[in-house]
Amino acid sequence: MKFLIIQKVKREVPIEKWAKLLPLQFKYFDNLEKEKAVEVYYHLIGQQGSMYIVNVDSDEKLSRIIGQDPMFFESEREIYPLTTRQTHEKQIRELLKP
């Protein structure tokens, strides 16, 4: 199962705390990319945030990835389940069958 996660640092986080946690988060995501749990990761320019796509087998794994992020308590996130265009098209065609 793939999920798009958009994560933004809360505005009230002191810059000193943010500066300490950010290198830990970089290392955390390096490890997730090596494990192939994170397929792609991008910084959101001018947003103090990032977006990434995770590929997990369970909601437990998704929860672990999010919960173990060093910036967990300092960020807000939106999580969206993803499907391929082909799967979406197939579902729509089935719905529209007479």
Q: What are the residue ranges of the model-derived segments?
A:
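Conserved, structured core segments of small domains
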Residues: 1-98
